Amino acid sequence: MLLDENKGTSTIPEFGKIQFEGFCRFIDQGLIEELQNFPKIEDTDQEIESQLFGNKYELAEPLIKERNAVYQSLTYSSELYVPARLIQRNSRKIQKQTVLIGNLPLMNSQGTFVVNGISRIVVNQILRSPGIYYSSEPDQSGITLYTSTIISDWGGRSKLEIDGKTRIWARVSKKRKISIPILLSAMGSNLGEILDNVCYPKIFLSLLTERQEQKEYLRSKKNAILEFYKKLYCVSGDLVFSESLCKELRKKFLQQRCELGKIGRRNPNQKLNLDIPENEIFSLPQDVLAAVDYSIRVKFGMGTLDDMDHLKNRRIRSVADLLQNQFGLALGRLENAVRRTIRRATKRKCLPTPNNLVTSTPLTTTFQDFFGSHPLSQFLDQTNPLTEIVHRRKLSYLGPGGLTGRTASSRIRDIHPSHYGRICPIETSEGMNAGLVASLAIRARIGHCGSLQSPFHKISERSEEEHMVYLSSGEDEYYRIATGNYLALNQGIREEQVTPARYRQEFLAIAWEQIHFRSIFPFQYFSVGVSLIPFLEHNDANRALMGSNMQRQAVPLFQPEKCIVGTGLEGQAAPDSGSAAIATQGGRITYIDAGKITSSVDGDTVGTELVTYQRSNNNTCMHQKPRVRRGEYVKKGQILADGAATVGGELSLGKNILVAHMPWEGYNFEDAILISERLVYEDIYTSFHIERYGIVTCMTSQGPERITKEIPHLDAHLLRHLDGNGLVMLGSWVETGDVLVGKLTPQPAEESLRAPEGRLLQAIFGIQVSSARESCLRVPIGGRGRVIDVRWIHKEENFGDNAEVVHVYIFQKRKIQVGDKVAGRLGNKGIISKILPRQDMPYLQDGTSVDMVLNPLGVLSRMNVGQIFECLPGLAGNLMNRHYRITPFDERYEREASRKPVFPELYGASEQTANPWVFEPNHPGKNRLIDGRTGDTLEQPVTTGKAYMPKLIHQVDDKIHARSSGPYALVTQQPLRGKSKRGGQRVGEMEVWALEGFGVAYILQEMLTLKSDHIGARHEVLGAIITGGPIPRPGTAPESFRLLVRELRSLAPELDHAIIYENDFQIDRKEV
């Protein structure tokens, strides 16, 4: 963060900085650490020695550019070279070579990785920090148990606990525990040293069990190790001490449960007042003794328990840590490979070279597996530029070593006071992962040890100057931090006023002289997505969460538009996302076209390539449009071209729409939205989408697959777009079912003869039928569009097989339609229910028809009043051609601070445009609308204004689905669910009620039984529908009923059932 010493102001750091810093730390430190830990490798006779010199590693320039890696579906990586030395002691030969370790994926300028042509992101993980923690919990009898938990750097745990009988144990698993003297003796201490170093020896002896100080196994370390091994592994009988037993104990217990690491070493040193060097990464007897002492203090009320949800007890595992772990894993595999190669060379009595010893396969495959399958390596969400920024700044409790969505408690998911200024209290996932996937606050950063830090202005007592200081979680609790209306106070009267402040996780009101730090600005506590919501303070937090999440689902529009009412952060979000092209150097523009901008800088020519109609990971269109002119002089950092969702370098996700909050014939019931046809015909909400369809040709057991235009048994109309090579031609308009790539797959000849036409041709004419079947790539349902690109990629990775991949890109232009979803920034969302002709829409007194009609009941119950505050200045700004940038929480200056500027702006717009209806004193903020159908004025004035409404990626073209026949579940014999499985629509309880309300008994019976899960009847029903005959009546029960009977029989009752027809109910009255 940069500090302007003259004005005391600061600039917001780059939003992707957290990823760049992590990768740079891995390149500068993590690589060297792991390479220096790579051991010298010798053969069994110690005649050959191999060694790597990791501090002199080199990264070569990438062989291909990032854009070419995306185009050819390759990985954007660099070759890693390390100097190596091989010594043969018999012949005294020394060979030195620079060997290739493998390909290391590189981070691009957007903070992501391109792996196999796909952009991926590595998410930061929140883990419990290694160290010693104290807690208490009641046992089954209600007695409080005090526990000290030692968490290792590997995630293993061991506990010291004082049970209900006031005895102290070391618990190594849920069912096994050992006494403290055995553990300490096995670690090298005797009873005398233990009692000398314990602060409370009498209490310590009273907590031991069965006078253990008199036991035989405490007199020697060997006996203690044997006793510890028996207790740990439940071994009975006599054991013989050996080095292998010690080695196994060291590997299974000490390394997994006692290795604290450099970060974990600081925790016991601070908590237990120890002075142990940080390079001592294992737990020592001193640690255990100090932990026992502190447990005794906690037992008698002299110590404090730890809050495990506090951020000071957690650390961030960044991209640097994850990549370093994978690199260390790859080097371990490389070490085994080198040992095998040396062993093989020794048997053959030949001297290998360093290049022969080292192979690049372990490193390359390890990173490919990591980026392809690791839970924290995720598919980059590229719906819009904001989505990419937020994805780079995510924090996850999930993943290896973390929590799971099913086991995490509500306490962990909840907001903690230590999150203040570090983790956004609003933005999180919805559903099972609520509270487990959070977002980094806008000014937070990750410290050197993985701690989250937040900046504050330090207030000096001697001078009026303020200095910016980053405080870690836990450090700010000991200072009084002003959080309230300090900005609204004049310097002369600050000392006389009481200021809201934060101290020890509580909010207090204290004098200004007692303040140590102050917050920087109101955005400090929120994430990027939440900071883009105007009038945030007038919203319910749940609706703000929905608004921030739905901004990330907005699709870039054909004609993006800047918001009239914003927060001022839009200008930084667009450049930091990487969607806009930025000038790297100042100069004069000499050439511009759709794909390139060239500038002259001190006689040199600098070219900037633009992105034109490229597909994102979410099938949206990425495109850059130049916004500079030829001959114009640009400065360094100036915007050269806008992205798909930016205008003038500002983030632009939606459109400023004239909305009216009123009911209209029930079409906006329950959040449904009524829109004007103007939004359709004038392409207001038109978006571009690019779908990719791929097909692979490979070698089969019958021969290679072929891409060709000559496809037998297919109509020529389906093949009309193919060229001579069997690929679809660029610019072709394709419909559902058209062939994009013609492919033939060989099959055995006897399979061809099984077909009736094959046997007929061979019997009559003696013609041998083709021994290949067509397996073409076709346009799926809903995939119609224009072909804009065809990529034929050759791969030689599958064990020497020359596999070929063809990708076809189809461009779609989607107008808004009934069923699409739109939403505002304040959590107001809805589905388009009807598109009205513009002449039927309500219109203003100047004849302007309303674009969108929203339900007014959606404001009161949801408590998102911010949308009313947004639309009124939006109307004034639209009439006066102004834009407003409003900082949230402006009511810290005075009461009703958000409301007071609204009416003056409306009055100014009314005066400037000579339209008195804009501001009517009798009902300010509301207008008299006229019904477009009748021409009559509506009875009540209506709140009307300009709201910023994005169109979301949840579109009806992607979701609509119909099933005529498809797969069934094996157990219930009912149709599967989901569009991807060609499933059916579930007729649930509420749907049954709706049909019952219309009295359609026969339709209900068919839907619930015959057409659903009756195996025999559904085939008969299909035939009856085709022929127009009556629906048959089956003589057996449906499968789900039979399943229910079987489940009930498992409880041992005898159940049977019979089918009763209508004729059986014709019973004579006398019999009754």
UniProtKB/Swiss-Prot annotation:
UniProt-annotated location(s): Plastid, Chloroplast
Xref: Pfam families: RNA_pol_Rpb2_1, RNA_pol_Rpb2_2, RNA_pol_Rpb2_3, RNA_pol_Rpb2_6, RNA_pol_Rpb2_7
MF term (GO), any: DNA binding
Catalysed reaction equations from the record: RNA(n) + a ribonucleoside 5'-triphosphate = RNA(n+1) + diphosphate
Alphabetical keyword list: Chloroplast, DNA-directed RNA polymerase, Nucleotidyltransferase, Plastid, Transcription, Transferase
The keyword Ligase is annotated on this UniProt entry: no
Family: Belongs to the RNA polymerase beta chain family.
Protein's name in the database: DNA-directed RNA polymerase subunit beta
Primary gene name: rpoB
